[in-house]
């Protein structure tokens, strides 16, 4: 019998360079490709697009001060980011019993050329991820991807989540873009309904901040700009929660589960307190028709993942221990690998054992269907 003591609810993979070689022939010229540069390997998401280097997507095993010093390629990156056997070995080193894996470059699916190639890439990725997890399904679960809600009036997202479910994927990541349809848009309703019917949690993962994406290269190079972006990127999560709560998405789909991934948890209590205030004081004249306090909805339908978040853990009662899931973020720059056990013990110092177990194992194991 499998015993789950530590489960990472948010780690990552790096998609293999040949992942999209079998997309329909008519779309092959539009498919993402890996190109090797002097600075390392990079994905080109669409013809003429700027390269997205894999440099910070596979740093596990390197010293922090060396992250950007040497080119990172598929030949020298940690193999656990794309090979299941190597993955399990790295999990053993880190004392992880199970791992929930998010996409790498496919987090940027919205940057592909058009609706058709985005759907084809989603299908290719979801099939590959399902096969990856078959290597050891008692320890590996993969998060699928679905295209933007904008694509084909939302129909592509519905098709992708149904395809992923048929392949055995148990949860999906929703692709988004600046200026795209908001999560409370009527066109999103068929997708939320499909996720609810399929009993598949939907993940909203942190992205780069809108502020950074609007900067010119010379502005981005100014000292402190990148550090600011990494510091504040978690705060964007509150916008997604607010839209879904006050937009009535949770009310219309009471069995829908949403995971807010890698955004930490320290912001959640302050957001919920403010949202409850808005519910009582401002909602009556602003027009939202929701009937339940946002803090109550959160406890029923929302989850959040975090790595090291002592402030959030201290305020855990304000959001519900059952909604919180620890993560290692392997093999990215925020990763706790290979010292997760040591970091967990420090981060959770003074937390009752039963509550700690829920946050570092039980909640994720239950949500993603790991079987003991």
Outline where the language-model segments fall:
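Short acidic, glycine/proline-rich loop/turn micro-motifs
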Residues: 110-114, 230, 341
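Catalytic pocket-lining loop regions of alpha/beta-barrel enzymes
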Residues: 120, 133, 137-141, 146, ...
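Short catalytic/ligand-binding loop motif for oxyanion handling, primarily in non-cytosolic enzymes
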Residues: 14-17, 99-101, 107-112, 150-153, ...
């Amino acid at each position: 019998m499998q015993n789950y003591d530590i489960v990472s609810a948010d780690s990552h993979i790096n998609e293999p360079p040949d992942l999209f070689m079998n997309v329909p022939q008519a779309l092959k010229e539009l498919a993402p490709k890996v190109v090797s540069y002097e600075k390392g390997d990079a994905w080109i998401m669409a013809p003429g697009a700027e390269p997205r280097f894999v440099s910070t997507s596979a740093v596990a095993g390197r010293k922090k001060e060396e992250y950007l010093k040497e080119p990172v390629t598929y030949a020298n990156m940690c193999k656990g980011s794309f090979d299941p056997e190597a993955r399990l070995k790295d999990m053993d080193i880190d004392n992880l019993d199970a791992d929930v894996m998010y996409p790498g470059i496919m987090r940027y699916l919205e940057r592909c050329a058009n609706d058709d190639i985005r759907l084809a890439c989603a299908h290719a990725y979801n099939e590959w991820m399902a096969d990856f997890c078959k290597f050891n399904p008692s320890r590996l679960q993969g998060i699928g991807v679905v295209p933007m809600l904008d694509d084909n009036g939302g129909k592509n997202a519905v098709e992708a989540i149904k395809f992923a479910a048929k392949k055995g994927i148990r949860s999906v990541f929703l692709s988004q873009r600046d200026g795209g349809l908001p999560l409370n848009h009527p066109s999103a309703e068929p997708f939320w309904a499909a996720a609810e019917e399929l009993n598949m949690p939907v993940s909203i993962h942190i992205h780069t901040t809108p502020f950074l994406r609007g900067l010119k290269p010379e502005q981005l190079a100014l000292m402190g700009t990148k550090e600011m972006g990494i510091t504040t990127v978690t705060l964007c999560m509150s916008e997604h929660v607010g839209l879904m709560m006050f937009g009535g998405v949770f009310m219309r789909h009471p069995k829908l589960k949403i995971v807010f991934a890698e955004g930490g948890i320290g912001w959640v209590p302050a957001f919920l307190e403010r949202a409850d205030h808005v519910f009582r004081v401002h909602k009556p004249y602003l027009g939202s028709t929701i009937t339940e306090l946002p803090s109550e909805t959160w406890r029923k339908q929302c989850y959040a993942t975090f790595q090291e978040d002592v402030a959030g853990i201290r305020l855990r009662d304000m959001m519900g221990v059952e909604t919180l899931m620890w993560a290692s973020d392997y093999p990215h720059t925020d990763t706790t690998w290979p010292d997760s056990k040591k970091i967990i013990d420090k981060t959770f110092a003074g937390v009752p054992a039963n509550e700690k177990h829920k946050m570092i194992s039980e909640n994720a194991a239950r949500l993603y269907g790991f079987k003991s």
